[in-house]
Amino acid sequence: MPKFVIEREMPNVGNLSDREFCAAAQKSIQALREIGPQIQWLHSYVTGNKIYCVYLAPDEATIQNHANKAGIPANRISAVRRMIDPTTAE
């Protein structure tokens, strides 16, 4: 299944409490359950004002549908074309 990186612009998101992150994750998981097994949240990276999420999904429309249901932005959705790591240099 295609992999996507979603950029979510969320001012001061890096300052949220553990409780707030828990509530946001629960809302996201509920939206995932409503959509079905064709979308999977792998993990997210939180910075000061953005969250970068990595998902598996059939297409961008499914990612946007999830964002709408969860009430969270999806400012940029980028399909992953290739992954590289230090072993790529070998």
Which ranges hold each PLM region?
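An amphipathic, aromatic/His-enriched active-site/gating alpha helix that lines ligand/cofactor pockets
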Residues: L56-M83
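A short linear hydrophobic-aromatic micro-motif
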Residues: P37-H43, R76
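Short, flexible active-site loop motifs that bind/organize anionic cofactors or intermediates
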Residues: P11, C53, A67
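Amphipathic, hydrophobic secondary-structure cores in small proteins
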Residues: W41-Y55, A61-I63
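Short S/T/G/P-rich N-terminal loop/turn motif that feeds into the first structured element of a domain
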Residues: M1-R33, Q40, K50, R82-E90
